[in-house]
Swiss-Prot record:
GO terms for cellular component: cytosol. It comes from the Bacteria. It catalyses: uridine(54) in tRNA + (6R)-5,10-methylene-5,6,7,8-tetrahydrofolate + NADH + H(+) = 5-methyluridine(54) in tRNA + (6S)-5,6,7,8-tetrahydrofolate + NAD(+); uridine(54) in tRNA + (6R)-5,10-methylene-5,6,7,8-tetrahydrofolate + NADPH + H(+) = 5-methyluridine(54) in tRNA + (6S)-5,6,7,8-tetrahydrofolate + NADP(+). GO terms for biological process: tRNA methylation; tRNA wobble uridine modification. It comes from Rhizobium johnstonii (strain DSM 114642 / LMG 32736 / 3841). It is an enzyme of class 2 (transferase). This is Methylenetetrahydrofolate--tRNA-(uracil-5-)-methyltransferase TrmFO. FAD binds at residues 14-19.
Amino acid sequence: MNTISSHSPIHVVGGGLAGSEAAWQIASSGVPVILHEMRGVRGTDAHKTDGLAELVCSNSFRSDDATSNAVGVIHAEMRMAGSLIMAAADRCQVPAGGALAVDRDGFSEAVTKAVHDHPLITVVREEVTGLPPRDWDLAIVATGPLTAPSLASAIQTETGEDSLAFFDAIAPIVYRESIDMDICWYQSRYDKVGPGGTGKDYINCPMDEAQYNAFVDALILGDTVGFKEWEGTPYFDGCLPIEVMAERGRETLRHGPMKPMGLTNAHNPTVKAYAVVQLRQDNALGTLYNMVGFQTKLKYGAQADIFRMIPGLENAEFARLGGLHRNTYINSPTLLDPSLTLKSRPGLRFAGQITGCEGYVESASVGLMAGRFAAAERKGEAISLPPATTALGSLLGHITGGHLVTDEEPGKRSFQPMNINFGLFPELQPGSIVKPEGVKRFRGKDKTIMKRQLIARRALADCATWLGQESTLAESA
C-alpha cells in the first residue's frame, strides 16, 4: 500500500536557474516542494550573492527570435509552459538588440521573491552533502557546474568512476549540410568498421603542406580566453587545446588529431594529403558533426575565422563552438532515462547544467521538464514527454540518448555539454521546403532560413498541443 500522499513534498537540491524553475513548476502543479540551497551557508568561487538564479557570467539569454532561431524557439516554448525564469527575464529586460538580456541583480531578486512568496515552496538554506536520502522518495538534483565536492563524490560513488566529469573539453560542432562534400569525403581510418560503423564514419578534410602551415600559424596567433582564477588549468592527457598542441611543435598536429595515415582522398586518390581534419557524427539524426580533437580556448570569433581556413569548411556553420571550462556534469545518455530519472535510483532526477546541457535557458528548460515530470509522478499521472519536434523535446532527447558515444574515447569525454540548436531537431518531411513563386534560384542561405522557419513553426505548434494535452490530464485528475 502506498503511504505517500499526493501532498508529500518533492525535494529540489540547488537554487540556480534549473532548481528554481523545477521548484516553480512543481508548485504550480499543486505539489509542495522543498528547495535546498547551500549559498547563505556555504558560498562558491563564482557566486557573489546568496540570491536564487544568480547569473555568474553573461547577462544575456541570447536570441529571442522564435521564428528562425533555436534559442528563441525554446524561449517561446518555456513561456508557453509558464516558466518562472522567462517571466523574470521579460520583467527585467534591458536593451540588447535582438537578444534577451537582463538586469542581473533585478533578475535574481525577482526569481528569489517569486519562489519565497509561493505558498507551496519552502526554501531551506543548507548544504546537502550526499545524494538525497531515500526517504525523499522524489527528488531533483540541480546543483550546476560548481557542485560541492562532497555531493559530487556521492554522485560518482552511485553512478561509477567514469560517469562524472569535472571539466568539459568541447570541440566545435558543424552542421552537416554546410560541409562541402566536393572537397571532403567519408572514410574511417584504414577503412576500419567499428561497432555500428560502415568504414565510412568520418568526414575528412584534406590539407596540403602550405595550407597546414598557414593553419598552424593562425592557431598560434589566435586570441584565447583565459581561465577564471578559480578554474585552474585543467589540461589532461588526450585533451590539450588544439592551439596548445600547435605551440608545442609545428608537426605535433599532423602526428596527432590531424594525422593523414590510413586515409585516401576519394576525389584525388593519387595525391596524399599532408594533414587531415576529421569530423565525426555527433548525433543519431546525422545532422551534426564534431571536429575530432579540436577542443580549444580560442575566442569564438577567432575559432570561426581559423576553422573556416580548413578545406571543405570555408562556409561551415557552427552549431557549437569549442571551449574548456570548469564544469561538473554526468554522462546523461547512459545514466538517465527519458524522464531524467537516474536509472539506478527511481525517483531521483537530475536537471540543469549537471545533465550536460549548455546555457542559461537550456539549464532552466531542463529544470522545467524535470519539475513537470516529478509533479506528474507525485500525482500519479502518466509522464508526458515533449515531442521530439519541439525545442524542449529535442534537447531532452539529446541529453538522454541522442548523443552517439564512441568506443574510441571514454564516455565522459565523448559526451560534452550541448546548447539548443537546429541540428538537434528531426528533419522536416520531404517536400516541406517549397521554392517561393517568382524566385529563380533557391538555395544556400535563403533555403536554410526557410528550413529553420518551418522547423520553428512546427516546434511551437507541437509544443502547444503537448501542453494542451497535459492541461487536459491535469483537469481530469
